[in-house]
Amino acid sequence: MNLTAKLIAATLCLGLTGQALATELKHWPAEQAKQLEAMIAANANKGNFAVFDMDNTSYRYDLEESLLPFMENKGLITRDSLDPSLKLIPFKDTADHKESLFSYYYRLCEIDDMVCYPWVAQVFSGFTLQQLKGHVDELMASGKPVPVTYFEGDVVKASEVQPPKVFTGQVELYNKLMENGIEVYVMTAAS
């Protein structure tokens, strides 16, 4: 086999390998997958990009709602270590129960989302991004529900919150976009 024939054969093999490794949108409804494929083909390798949200878009559940009790349960965030400026309302303690930061966060959300969302973002101040990433990685790797307590009226309820679970369909989409030269960015308002 001459050099030209070898190069053509190698090129065909590489092309077929690329086809075999191409991501399929298996976890998308057929009609939506078809529309996404068409959009990707129309925008492939043109220097385009796609931007997505993280919480409840790239994965199910909210990161902060599980990271707060996860870190609190480990003693990494406590009422005592909380910046005094973040003690917006009195804690709702009883003779038998000391209110958790998770419960406090929920009560702030009952006042208004514009109170609790900035509050929970600021709770993580004092941690470096590297430290937070380590705790997020640990939470995500555990995959286990995080035990919580909160007040429902004047009754203390025990429950658990789920850590984020990555949507398989979104991973497929991100991979498909990147395989076609479309940069993918994931943004979040979470800490």
Predicted regions and their residues:
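Sec/Tat signal peptide C-region and signal peptidase I cleavage site
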Residues: G18-A22
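Alpha-helical substrate-recognition element adjacent to the catalytic core
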Residues: T23-S191
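Bacterial N-terminal signal peptides that target proteins for export
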Residues: M1-I8
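Bacterial N-terminal signal peptides
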Residues: A9-G15
